[in-house]
Every structure is written in C-alpha cells, then in structure tokens.
C-alpha cells in the first residue's frame, strides 16, 4: 500500500494518483451508460513511463548486492508491467467498443495496479537505501561492543581509526535522510540522537584513554574509569539503536499521547492485521531471508502486540506476552536456520499458526481482538498525562451529565487527588497541610457521590447539579494549590544550579596538601548528588502536575531529568579519578563529563521554565525573597553573621533568577514596547542587587550597628520593589496597579489665612471655604450588554449536520470519530470573523462525509475523490491562515510552535488524496462493508488501504486541532498594526444545544 514517509515517494505518487483518479471518474461515468473517450494518448504516455521505470528497476536490481531488494523488487516491477498492459488492452478494446464492460474492468484494475505497484516499487527501493544506512549504524554498534576490551593505547588508536570513518558516514547519511522524511517527529529524533552521538564519541574515547592509563600505571580509580567508559558506550549504543528504530518507521500517530486505551489498541490491532499477510507469505516461502519485508512484518506485529498488552486487562496482557515471546523465539530460530540452509518448514508452520492465533483470521477470533473487546467492555479509557489535562477530562464529565464517558471523568479526578497526595510531603505551608488533605478527601467523596448518582440515573436533579458546582470549584482550588506548590519548589530548587557543581569542582582540584581533602570531596559529592536529585524530582513533578499541556515540553523535561539522574554518579566518579590522578587525561576526562552534565542541567532548567507560568514564577520568587528577608532579620536580632551572609546570598540568587527570566522574556518577544518595558525593569533590578549585597556585608561585619541594618533594609526593599516591577512589566499590570494601602498619612496643622494671590487678574483666596460636597449621583444601571453576534447560516448548517451524526454513532467509526473530536474542540468557538475556525469546521464536516463515502454509504467514486480534494483545499486554507498569523505573532516561541504544528497539515492532506484515490479504485469490488469500512469478503489490499486511510484521517484531524489551539494562543500576541483580524468569541454553552 502507498506509504509517504519520504518527500521523494510523495512527490512521485501524487501525480500518478491524479491520473488514476481521472481514470476512476471515467470508469464510473461509463457505468452510467456513457461512452468512454479515446484514451490512446494518455495511456501511451503511461506505458512509456512504465517501460522506463521497469528498465531502471531491473538495472537497479542487477547492480545491487542487496539480496532482499533483488527478492522484493521484481514482483513490484511485474505488477506495474502487467497493469500497464491491462491499460493498453482496455484502450484498444474501448476504441473498438466504447461501452465494453470488460474493457472498463481492465481499465480500473490497471489503474489500481499502476498506483499500488509504483508504491511497492518505491518502498522496496527506499527500504534498500535504509538498509544501507542501518548497515553503517550496525558497524558502529559492533565497534562500541568491543570498547570494553580495549586495554592498550595501540588498540585504542586502532579503535579510533576504525570507528571514525563509520561515524562520519552515518552522520552524513542521517543528515541526508532527515531532510527527506515527511514526519517532523522522526526528523527531530534522528537529529537529536545523532547530535548526542557526535557529542559523546570524543568523551567516550577520552574515558577509554584514562582507563588504559590508570590500568597501565596501577593507579587508583580503575573501577570508576571502567564505569565511566561503559556508561558512555551504552548511551551511544542506545542512541544508535533509537536511530535504527526510527529509520525503519513509515508511519506516525499524531495523537497517540492523548488517546484513550481503546483508540490506541484499535489502531495497533489494525496495523498488526494489515501486516499479517506479508508475515505469513514470508513464513511460507522457504527462500525468505532474514531482514526481508516479511520478517520485519513479524517484528512490527510483535511491537504492536506489546502496545496492546500494555493497555489490556491483566489476564489478556499475560496471554499476549506469552504468545509474543513464543513468536519472537521461533522467528529468531527460523532466521538462524535459514541462514544456515537447514530445513525450517516445520518451525515456520508453527510460527504461522501462533501468529494467526495472536492476530486472528476469518476462522480464528484471535487473542488481540479479544483483548480489545474485553477492554472496550470495561471502558478502556485512561486519564490524561498531566494534571491540566485531567482537569479538562473531569470538567467535561461534569459538563455533560447525560453522556457516558466509561468512567474517564471519575478516573481523572482520582488521578488528580493521587498526584496531590504525592505533593503533600513538600507542601511548605504547614498550617495548611490539614486543609490540603481535607480538600483531597472531600473531592474524592463528592466525585464518588456524583458517580453513584449517575449510575442510578439521577445525574440531572438539582442535588446532582449542586454537587457538580461544588466539585468544579474544589477541583480548580486543588489545581491552583498544586500549581503554587510546584512553582514554589521550582523557585527554591532551581535558584542556583551552578554553585553545587562549582564547589564540587573546587574539591576535585584541591591541592593534595590540603587537610581533609578527601573528606571535603565526599561532602561536596554528596551535596551535588542531593542537588541533582532534587532538581530532577522537581522537574518530574512539573511534568506530571504542572500547568503545561505541551507534549513536546513534557517529554523533554522527563528525558532531561532522567539524564541528570544518570549523569550525576558518572561526574562524581570522574571527579574521584581526577582527585587521585593529576594528569592531563584525567583533567580532560573530568572536564568533558562536567560540561556535559552542566549542559543537561541547564537544558532541564530551561524546559522547566517553559513549563511554568512566568508571572507566577516571579511572584513566587518575590515571596521567597521576603521569606529569606525574615530569616535575615532573625540573624540580625540573634547576632549571627554567617546566617546573614547565607540568607542574603539566597536573596541575591532569587533576584538573579528573576533577572534571567526577564531577559529570556525580552529575547522571546519582538514587540518593541514590551521589550523596552521589560529591559528597563531588568536594568533596574540588575542595579539593585549589588547595593543589597554590599549593605549585607556591612551588617555581617557589625550586626549590632543599627545604621548598617537600616541601610540594608532600604536596599533590600528597593530590590524587592524592582522584582515586583519586573513582574508588572511582563504582565503589563504596572499602569493599572492600585495605589498602596500602606501609605503613611501625616497630620498637617492648618495654616493662617494668606494674602490673595493674583494670577492674570484672577483673585484666588486660599482661605475661602470649600463649597459643600455635592450629593452622590443617582445610581444608574449600566446599559445592557449587547447581544452576541447572530448565528450565521454556516453555524446553523454546522449544528444541523452534527445533529445527524451524534457522538454515540461515531464511536464505532474511526474516521467519523476523528471528525467528531475536531468538532468537539471547535464547537466552543464562533466562526464569526475567524477564518481559521470556519475552515477547520468545514474540514470536520468534510471528513465526516468522507467516512460515509469510504464505507459505501451512498455517493460515487467521483464524490470520494472530490471530497478528498475539498479536504486538501481546506487544509491549505488552514495552513495559509496559520502561517499568516504566525508571521504577525511577536512571541518567538509561540510563532515556532504554530509553524511546527501547521506545517504537517499539507503533507497529510496530500497523502489523504492519494489514499482516497486508492480506495476509490476498490469501491464496489466487495459485497459488504464492515463496521470500520473494511471489506468482509474483500481483498487484503483493500483492508490495508482502509487502515492507512483511517490513520491518515486521524492524524489530519489531530494536526488541525493542534493548529487551532496554537493559533488561539498566538492571537493575543500579534502586532497591533498588522491589520490581521481574528476574533475568538467563546460561544455560550446553551448555543451548542
């Protein structure tokens, strides 16, 4: 079936699909009794192109040493050649008889074969190119596997000489491949992994060198050096394996992160079923080689089965994993036997039977389909990955009392209170801990009470609505508390990420003559480990419980936190090596790991800063500074100079963090007034920190000196005011800040009357009594709010359309369900003066119509082709508007996010047109259409085409949903003089009913 994971394949298939779609329409018109036009010229052009393609294909086969390519490409070439002959025969027959039914059948079969054969041909060649890259990757892996046995400098020199050319070749190939891929996520993974390999390779070689030196010179630290080397080699191995995995991917699921269990399982089952035929064909062919398409199909079925097992019920998961284990071991043995030339048919037959038992056939129900059915019966949904997402799920449950969400809303509430319980140990406001715990208990109680009422069919009475209102308020209160706790923790733990490392470095490089040198090293190593652990744990809390909903940011936080945890012991071991070995190699080795650790920690802090609200962070920083101000006052009162120094140092660190945040905000914006305002506030803050520190030093020298203490208080208050001004500059609240309620009002004695003052012959007497105070104005009620803009005809048509396609009917139809999900996202916005929302709503309706057409529920093949083309046109409109909005957005990160999510849409829409053309060539060739559009008694090809079409439609709807969300966020930060007008009017809830 067509695949589109490279730009080259997509560029070749699109014009072919356009020609095939014309032939499909001609075929359908002929079925209505019309004569088919003379096709001699277009068919002749196709034949010449096919002849040239076949010649190039066979030349490639003969010149290649890839035996898998030599086995896979000829069948595709033969199909293209046979399909071309069918077109030629149809052309000749139609010229003799324009109404010939046999000729029309040959025409459609030839068109279908040309498209699918060309796709198979391109995929076969592309897989051969991927295997070339993977061979280089495996060569690097082979060298990494022997890194542990290199024990001499000569061996190391040879190792570097051998591995360097392969690393260069792999890097060059990955850079070229990345530019070819159409899936953005795959491109990013390849680049990230390759960059990591480039960074780690010199560090690993240096680690190998220091290990050899320590071993040869019998110095201390041999075990630490070996662990450093093994860690780096393993990390490089993991990155290379990830590169190999991504290189072999041809599809990407855009919304798997947000999908419920049933949706993910259904997609995985569909993918596994589409691979079964290829796997069984390879098992039946005794000449099938390891690494061929069929063997890879088995491996992918195993991967999809693991994905299903991870979401299935426990008993189903155990059965799936046991079957997968059997299939994996049998496949490994089969590959080994075939490579040795032994008799493998018995083993292949057994493996085929196990595969059928796992995936299912028309005769066998299958373990995976049964697991999906059982999960559907129990609900199969899972809460979102973040607290913010879970809050949305819970509110959706409460806002739709008549809709059965299979317990998802209740699960989301329980997950929120469970995460809140994890925050309890770090809840700093001890006097409020009891209140925090009671709030969680009350939320659980009310959620259970509401679920019980709905279970008994009492979800709509006033009592249930009262519980909903209370539960909504309590959930929002809980989320606010969690957000504050996490922000406070971020402020505290990330205030200074450099000092623990700097102190550890000083301990590592301490002179051997210093007393208690090793004791100091152990202390600083423990401090570094504790600091890293706190940073990583806090970051993981931000990822799970923080306000960020961005998948990319959350995953980046988790990855960086895990790297910090893994690298910390390696840095300590490298420091221990340097402590006992004062050599250039030991210095270089330690510096390499220290810099890598520092980079990862800074990257983690950057991701955490992106995940929390800037204004909340600055307010929390100011509050923390005030708390440490209290500690300083206690130090002054108790005559504790060291405490004064420590606490003022922490205040200065908080101030510097706010300063760094302000600079980041200014760098992230292109709005001149905002940048000017923030930079001015940052300059005032920058100038306020040194005076506070200097005055604190004077207090530390003489805590009893009242003048010094007052000078410090004034400087500290000035610093706190500067921090507050930075927050006001970022939020834009400075101009509207209410006057201070703590002003000191002095009583001024009345003055004696003075002589008149003349101003341009007007006499003003200061002793003239003031006129009486006028009566208060009569209270006038404010004018009524203007009514919302009237619903347009488009809005009425949209509502009427979706009333005919309710959510309950969409649950068993994946394409309609994807369209419905987009509609649910868009129904909150009015399309009045918002072209992005209007175009996205059209896309949702068109996708629902496409679902009807591919299921054979009315319409013609021409309707299917035209519907796909209309979806592609609307996709271009959404992309154009999103790009236009992004260009006017003044916040760089928002702009990049919007551009990244909308750039996927045209590619997916083009793929949809091609897949719809493939489906159009198959419509009418089956007697019955199943619940997911699959043929009950049709070809395996049609089923595979349907699965790809479903996945493509789901990806397109998810990308449009992401684009609308990013556009709404970016709309509040557009240039005021841009002339761009996008109104985001949130529709009242009653308008959706």
From Swiss-Prot:
Question: Which SUPFAM superfamilies did the record assign?
Answer: alpha-catenin/vinculin-like
Entry protein name: Vinculin
Q: What family is it from?
A: Belongs to the vinculin/alpha-catenin family.
Oligomer status and interactors: Exhibits self-association properties.
> Which species expresses this protein natively?
Brugia malayi
Enumerate the Gene Ontology biological process terms: cell adhesion
| GO MF terms, alphabetically ordered | actin filament binding
Q: Where is the segment annotated 2 X repeats?
A: 258-480
Supply one GO CC term from the record. adherens junction
- Keywords, in A-Z order: Actin-binding, Cell adhesion, Cell junction, Cell membrane, Cytoplasm, Cytoskeleton, Membrane, Repeat
Q: Quote the biased-composition stretches of kind Basic and acidic residues, using this chain's numbering.
A: 758-768
